[in-house]
Each structure stands twice: as C-alpha cells, then as structure tokens.
Amino acid sequence: GVVCWAKAGIGAVATQAMALIEHGPLGIELLEDGAQPQEAMKRRLSLDKSPEIRQVAMIDYKSRISTHTGSDTIPESGHFVGDGFSCQANMMWKSTVWGCMADAFVGSEGDLSSRMLAALFAAEAEQGDIRGKQSARLLVVDSDIQQYPWEGTIVDIRVDDNREPLEELDRLLKMHNEYANINSLDEKSISQTKHTGNPEIAFWKSIGLVQSGQISEARELALIAFEENSGWEELLLRCAKNGLAGVTDDTIRALLHTKQDD
C-alpha cells in the first residue's frame, strides 16, 4: 500500500496527494523513537523537496495529531482535525467533503473501523473524488505495544480495484467481524451466520454448538457447509480421525445425522 501506515502501540500515518511513500514508514519510525506527531511531521516535511503538493496526517497512541495539506495540492483539498481524529481529502469535487467525513465519524456508532467506514461513505455521498471510485482501505491497530511485530493489527482490509470499493469494503468488514466472532455461539451470532451463509463459519460454529449441546442449531449450520461443498463433510471426518478441533465420533453422529435425515 501507499497511503496507510500504522504500528500497534505507536501510531498511524496517512500519506497522499502525489504521495511520498517514505513519509509513512519513516514517520512511524519517528513516532516510535519518541517524537510527537507535530515534531515528526516537521522533520518529515523538512526533508521533502515538494511539501506543497503533499497531504500527510499523523496520530500517535495518545491520539495526538498533526495534519498537513500542502498549498499546491490539487483542489478541492483540505482537512479537519477533531478530538482524537483527523479527516483529510484531496482532488474532491467539493470542499465540504472532509467536514462531512468528520460529522459522520463523530455521529456514527460502533467500533473504530465501522466509524471510519461511515466517514468514507460520507465522502462519497458528497460526490467524492473527481476521478471517480476505484480503491479503499481500512487499517486499524491496537493502541498498546505488542510483544511481536505480527501482533496488534485489528483490521487490515484492502480493495485495490473495484467499481464500488466502499460497498466491497463494507462486505469484507462484515465478513472480518464474523470471523472475529467465530467462537461466539449466542443467538445473535447464530442468526447472523444463517443470514450470511458463509460455509466455513457455519462449519466451525456447528462443531462448537455440538459441544455446547445445541444440536438442532448445529445441524442447521452444518447443512449450510455440506450443501455448499462436500469437502466440508470430508474435513469433519478427517478432524475426527486426527483428533483435531474437538471433533469426536459424537460430533460426526450429530452433524452427519443432518444428511442422513435428508
């Protein structure tokens, strides 16, 4: 990616508008070394031969922010800095875009990724980019430093080429959230899996439901997977044979009974 850079427990950088990619990773390095966003921004722009055409935003783990929109960025361009967030845009049809993004972010509910997506939809509703639509990304990391570099990424979803990138991003975020709650066996989660019909989630949930004694619900979800691809039935048998994922002979009897009844 070019625009989005983030590291758990450190902060995030967005570099765009004739983007100079190095502002992203090197900006993160400065934040990690202890520089506050304002100082990190100043140091990065001092090394940029054309800061007037760039747009860069930095935020650290304490929600301190610095945002720069160069004087020669392609209009309409600008930014809005709020309480713990920044919205920035360039090459927009309207100068109202970043304000609308901020309103949507503040006015929406849900987790951070959902609110960020709401801001993106608000930008598009305000006519968005003069070039049209193609790509989008959501990147969210933990505010706490993690032990290992591969930990701490909460959401990282990219749509590189799509006629409706925000709708696709929304679809993928919902799928991501469903996977994140794959072990949840409450009524709401089960109902959602029935609605979306994702065979993998249905398969693994069905195993958990058998283990919790919810056999009827387990069979209903298992059928979603079995009807999608016979390989899920084979996987169930192989898991039992190898003693994996808590699958036992009782699990097989409970779930394959679904097909025997048919």
Give a label for each model feature.
Residues 232-259:
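TPR/TPR-like alpha-solenoid helical repeat scaffolds
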